[in-house]
Amino acid sequence: MQLGWKHFKEEEEDHVLVPLSRGGGSRPVKLPLSTNKDELMKTCKGLLFPDGKSIFGKEEEMTFHLANFKNEKIEVTVNVDGNELPFNINNYIDAHKVKNVRIYLLSQKPF
């Protein structure tokens, strides 16, 4: 799967991709299909905020969400064929009918 990072830019009023040169980029990772939302968030923060820091500031100064390839926030459940199931990578694949998973860490500093 691929992990990416989008940080909120006030002037764009949207989350914008962070390039590799600024600590983002598209990062290939191997995770168990049973990985849940909290575990995935922890992996993203560890990868993109080494030592709790980034080019945009400290981890504790920001709010975070996970988003799918359509920029929709990932919730604790996912709809698979009309059934609400707990989010994990396997259920996400089933819900979106994708083979190559791409998930984004969304970060924002409070105003």
Q: Where does each model-flagged region fall?
A:
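Phospho-regulated scaffold assembly regions enriched in serine/threonine/proline and acidic residues
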Residues: M1-F111
